[in-house]
Regions:
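Carbohydrate-interacting regions of secretory-pathway proteins
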Residues: 33-274
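C-terminal segment of classical bacterial N-terminal signal peptides
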Residues: 26-31
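General helical structural elements
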Residues: 14-16, 271
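N-terminal secretory signal peptides
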Residues: 1-12, 19-21
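Extended, hydrophobic interaction surfaces within ordered domains
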Residues: 13-14, 250
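Intrinsically disordered/low-complexity terminal segments and short unstructured peptides
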Residues: 16, 20-23, 166
């Protein structure tokens, strides 16, 4: 179901991203972290300074394998095909904020972008399930009940081992997904760039967070933690578990569903506190 709501201008979105990158590019990581209210760069493009893996085993594994390659954070199971995954978390914690991050993933991995996360991997997750019957952009309760606001699924068409097209199906009714707003599958497909870098932007604000996501300037989902209804969602319990602030994190899903040798890639991680 598509609800009318003004969309972020693609041109303005791209100009804002360029301006933010230019502002933070010359700042050392430590100095950038001290500037509140402005865009800061959480990833220097060369090292994993300012980041850490889950310190203890969680449901997805001991941490997965994370390294920097060609200016991007790369994640994969450790070793490939072992089922051993995990998360990479920012050392700095955020409560109310906006974040932009570029991603370029292989087709097949189930990943995620974590908000207000703790070292146990509990969080509000922006799904990055880039596989058949997957979803990218809606909200899921990782370790906080398993509530799910996905409004539709995505499926891939693969030719000669390469993803060539994406389709959408299994559209949910508003009472099933519970979103304040969702784009249509057609809008999502139009926004996504196959085999290219895609920019995810997320705004997270409030005691019971109001979370909005965009892909390449297209508004994808608006989730209201104060009013969301789902059998597995208890807003007070989630708030007690996560607190007011948490890390930003990226995920390598554990288990056998992750294709052997598949990788996820992230870069240009810009955050500003609100």
């Amino acid at each position: 179901m598509h609800y009318k709501s003004h969309l972020v201008s693609r041109r303005r979105f791209l100009m804002d991203t360029v301006a933010a990158t230019a502002t933070t590019a010359s700042l050392p990581l430590g100095q950038a972290l001290a500037v509140k209210g402005e865009w800061i760069n959480l990833f220097d493009g060369k090292t994993l300074e300012g980041w850490h893996r889950n310190p203890q085993r969680i449901g997805h594994g001991t941490g997965g394998k994370w390294y920097v390659e060609d200016g991007a954070i790369v994640g994969e199971q450790d070793p490939p095909g072992s089922g051993n995954g995990g998360i990479l978390l920012s050392d700095r914690k955020f409560g109310d904020f906006e974040v932009k991050i570029d991603m370029n993933h292989d087709w097949g991995p189930c990943s995620g972008f974590f908000l207000r996360a703790n070292d146990k991997g509990q969080c509000f997750q922006v799904m990055v399930d880039f596989h058949d019957a997957g979803n990218v952009g809606h909200i899921y309760g990782e370790g906080t009940g398993g509530f799910n606001s996905r409004a539709f699924d995505i499926n891939g068409q693969v030719k000669d081992g390469k993803l060539v097209a994406i389709t959408g199906d299994n559209i949910r009714k508003p009472e099933e997904h519970g979103c304040v707003y969702t784009c249509t599958p057609e809008e999502w497909i139009k926004a996504w760039r196959i085999a290219k870098w895609n920019t995810l932007m997320v705004r997270c604000i409030g005691k019971y967070p109001h979370i909005t996501s965009w892909l390449n300037g297209q508004k994808i989902c608006e989730f209201d933690g104060a009013t969301f209804k789902h059998p597995n969602y208890d807003r007070e319990k989630v708030r007690s578990t996560l607190g007011e602030k948490g890390s930003i994190a990226v995920q390598v899903h554990g288990g056998g569903g992750w294709p052997k040798g598949a990788k996820v890639r992230w870069r240009n991680i810009l955050v500003r506190e609100l």
